[in-house]
Amino acid sequence: MTRVNSIIGFRPIPVTLLTVITYVSLFSALLFIDRQPPAVAKKGELDYWGVDIEEAWSDLEVLTRDFHPYNSRPNDDVRAYLLGRVQEILSRNGVSGFGNELQSSGYSGTVDLFDDGIPGKPGSNVTFVGAGSEDLTVYFEGTNIIVYIHGERPADELSPVLVSAHYDSVSTGYGATDDGAAVVSILQIIKSFTRPESQGGKRPKRGLVALLNNGEEDFLNGARAFAMHPVAKLPHSFLNLEGAGAGGRATLFRSTDAEVTKYYKRAKRPFGTIVSGDGFKAGLIRSGTDYSVFVENLGMRGLDVAFYQPRSRYHTTEDDARHSSKRSLWHMLGGSLATLRGMTDDTSKVFDSPNGSAGKGHNAVWFDLFGRAFSVLHLHTIFAFTITLIVVPFVVVLVAMWALGHFDKLYFFSNTAYIPPPPEHSIASRTTQGWRGVLRFPVAFVAASAGVVGMAFLINKINPMVVYASQYTVWTCFLSTWWIIAWVILRGADAVRPTALARGYGFLEQWLLWLVAMIGVAISIGKSHLGSGYWVLVFYSGFFTSAFISLLEMAALQKKSEVKIAVSGDDQAYPPEEHSQTGASGNISNRAANDDDDAGEHATEETPLFRGPNRPLSFAPHRNPRYDNGDHDSGDILVEEKDEAVYGGEQGWSKDLPSWTWILQFLATVPLQLVLAGSVALLLGNALAQTGADGSDMLTVLLGFGVFSIILLLPVAPFLHRITYHVTLFIFVIFVGTFIYNLAAPPFSPNARLKVYFQQTVDLQTGENNVHLVGHPDYIDRIVSKHIPSAKGKVDICQADKLKSGLRRCSWKGIAPRVVPQAPGGMPPEYGFSDWISYNVTKTGDGKATIKLRGRNTRACKLLFNKPLAKSPTLGNPIPGFPNTRELRLWSRDWERGWSVELTWEKEEDQEENKDSHSSAIVVCLWSDGNKVSDEIPALHEIRRYLPVWAIASKLADGLVEGSVPFMI
């Protein structure tokens, strides 16, 4: 039995080994999955899908040669390249099609290509109200590329599926991940779905609409323009491919419902959790994707799959092919192929309701396991499980405790005196000591958690941005803090006052803790329809199971009233007749009352610091009067004789407890919990660690790290007192290193550079130009004053930025831009500012005017009004019913064509005040091409050249340069 206990019993070596192996192996696996995308499929699998990863990578390299925002010449080059590639793919596969009019749902061909914006043909123009701003109106002319691959069944019978990506980049990023990888993936998807049968092709049951839209980065404009195209009325489901990071794995960002999410299960390497979707739903993630347009404007149901890390490279020059990989590309492409094949081969009517709409699905909860398995559940099912698990286990525990109490076997919360008691001169325990250990986990939990929270406040005070480049050292510091404090308390208490109930109390009390969390989960589901607490159910169920096992263990024990205590000293167990029942009763009650806390007499200088069974109460050589009846020497003191199955100084009755059940409890509470919580922790860590550059409160981020550090170690708490000191000593060394590092290390590095945001504004009337650099308030002043030559001693003001909350803006008179070509002669650019914008205002009536405006070398301008418009501006496809416009943004598919806009204000006599005031406005045009900054935007070139190596520039707004002219109406 001793040998068996040493192998599988609840002993230090088995517990330590299993704990260390489990945590190290699972953490290593989770980190590997998080950092390393899966390998590219072998040739056989690529041939099965009919795709070529080398060809896709070659396309990506072409697309990312230049910055290509909508308002740039390279954007036209990218569009021409993509159009040519689509035609090449269709021609190679023996199909062709080209049209701009959708006649019916029954086509004679198999593929139609729509060049939306071809010269001489009407394109998709759209006017809409800016999201979240009622006084903003946007007019946009689309230049999308649409490929409609027809299915076996017509669109009016089975709606086609939409797959979408945007081919524009931001003005400061090459767009390899945002959204080049998605664009080249769609090229390969078109290739796969149009293969002839001789090459392994298979015509889908439903059609597939492949959309390459232009203008997503500026306000989701491309998707809104697509909504005006006739093809947009056909699909009811979609897969949107995005990029909000720079490489890594593509995660399922969000989903409309469970029915459409199930298709993502077909992906060979699924990745994602509902936590990201709930982040959008709760408004915690403010950035948007085309997903919003497809759902809110077109009523579709679908998926949003996106790259999401590292955020420090997002919208910067490091979003290039060099910082991405073929592994990342294949992860998106492979998952998309499997998902779309499932969606297009589905012949059910789940997305085709009788009224012609996409119907409505059920809220979903989803998560992956090790990037290989994927679970999709209905939210209402999770809610039902939650309510059931709150009620049923609570009743089960109460019944089990009642039954154990009824049979006199409930050792928890007991201090039952042994009858007959040990002799007067024995130091053996006189009660079951069932209360011992009841407060250990609560005290350890509170103290260790307080230590982690305190550490978060300390780091936030001294070096809050260290998590930006070193999130793993922050994780390690928080984890080691909690472990050390909890271990010292739990192991120390076990050494001083050992008890066989410590593990059981730990499970029972954690189960109650997770019960409170379950109530919170139920409320979040019921009120807000948020399913991010799915992992709490696993924690709760595991700890209920383990707590119930601890209760079942007591069924193997003797009745408390039948426990006999043997003592040794003269190798004789005391006979019952030595103590009459009457004689014992007077002492039993007193001794029992004091047995658990050993506080029978007042402390003296000889009272020991620690007391416990089998320990003398003093280091002094004389007899203790408490156990001395005058007839015995100190050497005659009797101690409790315990079975070899009893560990250390634990209660003698624990010899009958099963020694192996801790393994079941460990398996119920540790592995799956670590996998689920660890996946969520890494997702949140990657998503939040670098948001400080966007103005996020770093204390909130650090506390989030702290909370999940606590959660990750809670499963091991009931076992901590059995883990040897060697582990904690090693962790302490790690803690010291990470603690010093987190307080002293530079927060940024060449691999995780702090983003600062650039824009230059020019008053074309006065010739005054200002450079604006926005960044983190702790660093932006230093960057501008110490590193930018043109700003040294010339910074006019640094103050809180109005556009980016939490950040600080520094402005100074910079080097004049040359974004508009000038006549030769070497004149300073300031002399040509007046030619950048031309406009003409004609008053057509009281409160009415027509303005014609045009910007040189641009196709993006805007009008800012001092008074809100009374009616919608008339231009393109106006949407009636949204007056009060104070800002009108204008986008044209043609260069320097300009716009003619009819405007209507309230009549002067209808205004209650400022009757004598005139309406005024400002014409602003944008220049967004950052490819020749040394010549055209030297201020940005200077910033890129002189920024410290740990900082990198990104765009502040749609235009890198804004030129403005005010006028009166």
UniProtKB/Swiss-Prot annotation:
Q: Does the keyword Metal-binding apply?
A: yes
Site annotation (Transition state stabilizer) points to 314
Could you tell me which residue ranges are on the Vacuolar side of the membrane?
A: 34-381, 460-469, 527-531, 684-698, 749-969
Q: Which Gene3D superfamilies match?
A: Zn peptidases
Q: How is the cofactor bound?
A: Binds 2 Zn(2+) ions per subunit.
Enzyme class per UniProt? hydrolase
Among InterPro entries, the record links this protein to:
Fxna-like_M28_dom, M28_fam, Peptidase_M28, PFF1_C, PFF1_TM
Task: Give a yes or no for keyword Chloroplast in this entry.
Answer: no
**Membrane disposition:** Multi-pass membrane protein
Record family assignment? Belongs to the peptidase M28 family.
- Role noted for this protein: May be involved in vacuolar sorting and osmoregulation.
Q: What is this protein called?
A: Vacuolar membrane protease
